[in-house]
Amino acid sequence: MFRLPVSLARSSISRQLAMRGYAKDVRFGPEVRAMMLQGVDVLADAVAVTMGPKGRNVIIEQSWGSPKITKDGVTVAKSIELKDKFQNIGAKLVQDVANNTNEEAGDGTTTATVLARAIAKEGFEKISKGANPVEIRRGVMLAVETVKDNLKTMSRPVSTPEEIAQVATISANGDQAIGNLISEAMKKVGRDGVITVKDGKTLTDELEVIEGMKFDRGYISPYFINSSKGAKVEFQDALLLLSEKKISSVQSIIPALELANAQRKPLVIIAEDIDGEALSTLVVNRLKIGLQVAAVKAPGFGDNRKSTLTDMAIASGGIVFGDDADLVKLEDVKVSDLGQVGEVVITKDDTLLLKGKGKKDDVLRRANQIKDQIEDTTSEYEKEKLQERLARLASGVALLRVGGSSEVEVNEKKDRVHDALNATRAAVEEGIVPGGGTALLRCIEKLEGVETTNEDQKLGVEIVRRALRMPCMTIAKNAGVDGAMVVAKVENQAGDYGYDALKGEYGNLIEKGIIDPTKVVRTAITDASGVASLLTTAEAVVTEIPKEDGAPAMPGMGGMGGMGGMGGMGGMM
């Protein structure tokens, strides 16, 4: 029998294994486009049912805890994973549309998904009849630019708290209580203020506004407590000693203590840490002679801590000791180096500094500096931290506590609150247009003037024209009426005239408070057209072939059957 050399045999086997590990399934043309479109349809159908005031909820199974009930388009889109790989690719591409829209505008994900499906479907149909996909994409993009320009022209600024409440109410699925709460929060902390959403502990929604600088570090020692009402430290008109370095030596803080004593004002020390004889001296003097003093660890880590301490220094009119820029030693401290605040409240978990005495010009300059950093950063985490710092400096933080009788109810409501909050911010940023899909319908007539260079580009414009009808049609369909009839009636009118799906009547949507943020509508059509028109240009799709499970049985193990002879061991009884 002929045998291969061992090395050749091994290389042949390893090549087979490599091929098995990297085997791909490649499909072409109309067949694969049809499969991707099936995936797009499944995802879009699941998301579209949530659209409009009479949209339904979707229940999503979770690997842990209770199923999630939501009406949030992006949450539904993210949850969808299809078994067929080619269908799943179609679904995932439209999922990206929803994600992109959510990241940029914070709302409008359902509109984006509905538009993406319409553009992809029409595009595939035209390509199957011989149209050039690249030219169709160019036509789509030309049409979308015209739509965006028209939306900008239609847009009007949001100015009153009532308009803010209307935007929030629409995005919260018609929940007026949420709309009013968000409007109130924005009124209190300003348009640039930070509004955070947390789980409440009661059945009702609550709004708490934290003014001044609050951070999550409490007193180092409970011996600093001076209030009979709860375990906290309360000072009025206090001095602030800020240090970037750890304080261990008592000699370094004696000058500051003497200054505070001479001024007859309490002293709050905020440093990287305070320990050793410095801490024990403060505690002993607090207990024995009633020295008005408290020590707190500085919040954050690394550069973030350094920046936060500088914010505090600017807000209170002091300096940060230990900072490389300020070469002043703690021992050489003067009164002008200490910050001043009107009120201080310190609990075991957090510290609140109110009414800082810093110069307004310095605070404004610092706030503008942070705004520039927010624009430059690409990290979401970094952006969030910068916005928190900006809010502390500017106008405080509003805390929305979402209440409910169960975790499922609270989570569902939180999704709507987040949507409403994002929509409101978008409206403040770029203004509003008539809602209910009307703004997109008003853009249709403007597409007549789009200049194209060939017939296929004209087809691309026509695809967008048809897609623009879909949001209004879907909202009407979910409300149980004939979508095509509603679209035709709204198209025959002009301006802000549209369909109120909640009440089932027509009228001026701006007057009715049915409005969409311009940024949300613009982002939805931009993201939907970009991904969907690219999808239509695909001619081949490559996926991995799943590896077969189960390793082959080990050879030679069959001989172990002889162990049956061990039955004779029964005689040992």
Curated annotation (Swiss-Prot):
Gene3D superfamilies (UniProt xref): GroEL (3.50.7.10), GroEL-like equatorial domain (1.10.560.10), TCP-1-like chaperonin intermediate domain (3.30.260.10)
SUPFAM superfamilies: GroEL apical domain-like, GroEL equatorial domain-like, GroEL-intermediate domain like
Tagged with keyword rRNA-binding: no
Chief place where the protein resides: mitochondrion
Pfam families: Cpn60_TCP1
Key words of the record: ATP-binding, Chaperone, Mitochondrion, Nucleotide-binding, Transit peptide
Subcellular location: Mitochondrion matrix
Single GO cellular component term: mitochondrion
Gene Ontology annotations of biological process type: apoptotic mitochondrial changes; cellular response to heat; mitochondrial unfolded protein response; mitochondrion organization; protein folding; protein import into mitochondrial intermembrane space; protein refolding
CDD domains: GroEL
Transit peptide boundaries: 1-57
Claim: Phosphoprotein is one of the keywords in the record: no
InterPro entries associated with the record: Chaperonin_Cpn60_CS (IPR018370), Cpn60/GroEL (IPR001844), Cpn60/GroEL/TCP-1 (IPR002423), GroEL-like_apical_dom_sf (IPR027409), GROEL-like_equatorial_sf (IPR027413), TCP-1-like_intermed_sf (IPR027410)
Domain of life: Eukaryota
Single GO MF descriptor: ATP-dependent protein folding chaperone
HAMAP family membership: CH60 (MF_00600)
NCBIfam families for the chain: GroEL, PRK00013.1, PRK12849.1, PRK12850.1, PRK12851.1
Functional note: Prevents misfolding and promotes the refolding and proper assembly of unfolded polypeptides generated under stress conditions.
Family statement drawn from the similarity comment of this UniProt entry: Belongs to the chaperonin (HSP60) family.
Protein name listed in UniProt: Heat shock protein 60A
Organism, as annotated: Drosophila melanogaster (Fruit fly)
Gene: Hsp60A
